[in-house]
Swiss-Prot record:
It is found in: Nucleus, PML body. Residues 141-168, 338-351 have a biased composition (Basic and acidic residues). This is ETS-related transcription factor Elf-4. Keywords: Activator, DNA-binding, Nucleus, Phosphoprotein, Transcription, Transcription regulation. It comes from Mus musculus (Mouse). Residues 311-332 have a biased composition (Low complexity). Residues 136-202, 301-362, 493-512 are annotated as: Disordered. It comes from the Eukaryota. Residues 169-182 have a biased composition (Basic residues). GO terms for molecular function: DNA-binding transcription activator activity, RNA polymerase II-specific; RNA polymerase II cis-regulatory region sequence-specific DNA binding. The modification Phosphoserine is found at S187, S633, S640. The keyword Ion transport does not apply. InterPro entries: Ets_dom (IPR000418), ETS_fam (IPR046328), TF_Elf_N (IPR022084), WH-like_DNA-bd_sf (IPR036388), WH_DNA-bd_sf (IPR036390). The gene is Elf4. The lineage of its organism: Eukaryota, Metazoa, Chordata, Craniata, Vertebrata. Residues 86-205 are annotated as: RUNX1-binding.
Amino acid sequence: MAIALQPSDLVFEFASNGMDDIHQLEDPSVFPAVIVEQVPYPELVHLCSGLDLDEVHNGIIRDRTLCMTQDQILEGSILLTDDDVSTSNNVSSTEVLFNVATPSDVLDEKQIFSSPEVLSDSNSVQAINLPNFLLSTPEPDDLKKTSDAGDQKEHSEEEKVSREENLRKMGKARKRNRKTKNNRSTSPVTDPSMPIRKKSKDGKGSTIYLWEFLLALLQDRNTCPKYIKWTQREKGIFKLVDSKAVSKLWGKQKNKPDMNYETMGRALRYYYQRGILAKVEGQRLVYQFKEMPKDLVVIDDEEESPETPEDSSQASTSSTPSTSTIRRASSRVGTRASPEDKDNPPWEKPKVQHTGLQPSASLELGLSVDEEVPTTSTMLASPLQSQARLTKTVSSSPAPSNIHLGVAPVGPGSTVTLQTIPLTTVLTNGPPASTTAPTQLVLQSVPQVSTFKDTFTLQTSFPLNTNLQENQVATQGAPLILSGLPQLLAGANPQSNPAPSQVIGAGSAGPSSQPPGTVIAAFIRTSSGTSVPVVKEGPLRSSSYVQGVVTGAPVEGLLVPEETLRELLRDQGHLQPLPSQVLSRGSHNLSLVGNQTLSPPSHPTVGLTPVAELELSSGSGPLFVTEPSVTRSPTQAPFSPFNPTSLIKMEPQDI
């Protein structure tokens, strides 16, 4: 066999030893196995030299890219014509031939696409000419050896590369698909660090397990003895005292109003398999925690036991007066706040205080600007303590004393100070022998241009023995004020010809007569929010204040709400009206107008003026504005005695 190297074609010539004429080579019938193949580009031949076998191949060029005929061109009888030329190129030629015929990829992707043209069709390869080289063909044995060595190298390198790529791809796929999940503990009770409340799956709100909810109920003082309780805390055994209530609470927690014990019981049975809870056999609604959690709040049953009746009775009697009486009294007083003063607090309710008689007691009051609110009032009242204390008799006191009551018109943010002097008057059937001077009740008010005071009188004629209680009580509900005065107003028995008492007004020209034991009950209202001076501790103010003095039998006073007084007076329809006097003030000056008779009220009341009667019939209406004057009645109407203790309704718990 002879191989000729030409610049454009690679020609393999197969001839027999008996051929001498070169022209016979043109006859195809004589040499049917001579084949000429063409390479697409000359530079591609250098790529097939076997130096690039370590690079990754792709599937662009297959067996059909460099086509060969179906007839085999290599046979055992083929001989090389020129051994001297072919010995130097044995290895390179065999590599080129086997690289062309190998079924694997032979070209690198980068080198293929870096060429100016890409092979588009396998059929077009047949029309491309290859450069002609004269190569020496080795023997078939040598070809087999070299081909085996080349194949082993290629396969080993390709397997290594494919394995590395597969490992990388599998590692990336595992990282993308798998997500780390926290191992859930078999028994959450054993993990004290685990929080009770956890975020839900959607990230909204929080969720809580049923066993955690039961633990929370067992540690709550509001539910532990009442709905659920420990039977054996050391063993973790508890009982559902009220299973319906517990299930309702659990339904409220889970936002399921129709939750019942049957549904909750299925959830409890789920914890049997998890090893968290266990059912105590033979006992209904009794469960047990398999493992008790740590840091539990221990609630003793003794702390939750209700108070004994003796303790409750002592607590009720220790308050002066009782809370029930305070609530009843305060419920009768209604105050309305204007829209402008909604931010300001309403009547502040003072707490019950147990102190001795003080020279002065102050109470902070807040009133609206444009609304008329009654500040204080005085009336006959029975003691708010027990009846046993009222029957104590005390000997006569060495000397009477005066009661000074100062009332200032109340504006927004102003204060009312009640000045009192300790009173040691003894109430008996008659004036005590040692009494050297009559008791005086002084009503003092700070003048204001738009302040009006309605005054009416009450007659005390029922004999009552009381012991002066050395305490001061400020009860809840404004303007209910019990300030340093005894609880009862009482006087001597009605005399046939009572000695007239004098009522003196500041700057007045003449006195007016009243039977002994009368009390001036004053309603003071304000209709403007102008600032006014405040009555403070110390002696009485100057004479510019309005003062009403009642002299006569020993009297004592008590401040109660106006609404309470009206309700009590409605119940006393059988009482006769008493002669009344009106002390009205509209400015700093007073003038006395006499010989004016007041018409009796439309229905029986106790000494109410027409203004008070008008307010009583129409509720809290506008006040009757009058000129500054003092009006008195020339004659006195007969009066009938009545029991002042009937004005306050006593209940069994108050006794």
